[in-house]
């Protein structure tokens, strides 16, 4: 698939078929994502793969908003960053997560990013319990790892509506002479 086509086709999809994603497909997608650039080539990002439906259901309950759909994904990948490797672990993890979304598209998988880091479990209690702490209660995430996001992966027959027109020219700014 050409890069431009991949950019055009990649969409956040929240509806998945019950068909499991083959381990070989997941492994390929994950390895491609980890080939993404990182600050000072630190490779500070780690990917935690969850395919157990009961564990995925628990992950889906990490927030009372925007994460329930995860329960129907055949695979969820937690994108983690080693906070001891670099102070840019969030940026590195975001680059890897973006590469993961495009690698999934290339493999014929649907995907959707759900942010974890700095997000409360309850939307109306921003200073309350945090989604990241909730996940640490039942997942073996090392203390030195921060969890940036969860990415749902799966096959889907859902066809999202066409993207609305967007004038990229209004977001490109050239310095004045």
Would you name each region that the model predicts?
Residues 1-177:
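Acidic, surface-exposed loops and disordered segments
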């Amino acid at each position: 698939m050409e890069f431009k086509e991949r950019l055009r086709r990649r969409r956040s999809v929240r509806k998945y078929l019950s068909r499991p994603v083959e381990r070989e497909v997941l492994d390929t997608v994950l390895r491609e994502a980890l080939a993404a650039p990182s600050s000072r080539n630190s490779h500070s990002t780690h990917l935690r793969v969850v395919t157990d439906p009961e564990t995925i259901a628990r992950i889906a309950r990490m927030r009372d908003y925007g994460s329930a759909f995860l329960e129907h994904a055949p695979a969820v990948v937690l994108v983690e960053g080693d906070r001891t490797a670099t102070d840019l672990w969030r940026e590195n993890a975001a680059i890897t997560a973006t590469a993961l979304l495009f690698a999934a598209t290339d493999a014929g998988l649907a995907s959707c990013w759900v942010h974890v880091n700095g997000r409360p479990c309850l939307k109306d209690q921003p200073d309350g319990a945090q989604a990241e702490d909730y996940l640490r209660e039942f997942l073996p995430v090392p203390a030195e790892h921060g969890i940036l996001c969860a990415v749902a992966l799966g096959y889907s027959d859902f066809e999202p509506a066409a993207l609305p027109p967007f004038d990229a020219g209004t977001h490109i700014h050239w310095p004045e002479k």
